[in-house]
Amino acid sequence: KRQEAAERVILNMGMTFGVHGSDDGHEQIFPFDIVPRIVMASDWERIESGLRQRMRALNLFIDDVYHDQKILKNGVIPSDLIYSGKGFLQPCLGLNPPRGIWCHIAGIDLVRISDGQYYVLEDNTRCPSGVAYVLEARQVMKRTFPELFEAYRVRPVDGYPSQLLETLRSLSDLPDPTVVILTPGSFNSAYYEHS
């Protein structure tokens, strides 16, 4: 019953995504499992530390590609693999981004396998999506299982939008910059997140 109730709430909220390959703009509701995946605080602290380290490494990698190119000169990665990539932008060679940060946000997908360890499945750095679903899913969980949030110290996620805004504002030298989100429009599969 609670699964059905949660799915009704999700439908009423318009939490949908476009189906890949659908030419008619077909959408379906965001898949939602009422059984929470519990991550212990000690595990999360280790994961968070690793994710921060990974972001530093990704930024150092990008900076090297657009500056010294040691990773290419030392043959760690073949040059043609980088230069032929859709994401490589030759005009960025020698560019120094604000605060020295190339990649400000990433959707890093994790999996937990049978040995209990977490592994990175992929780094979504070009156009990370999914956080709006996390925020809304948390609200659905609070409505569906209020007793869980009363009985346990569940870490909040609702501060993410303000943290993202502050991150984006920090890129400007203006005292009170305006931040906007550009979207391809309502037929984009992640439009729910853009809106």
Regions found by a protein language model. Name each.
Residues K1-S195:
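Preference for protein termini
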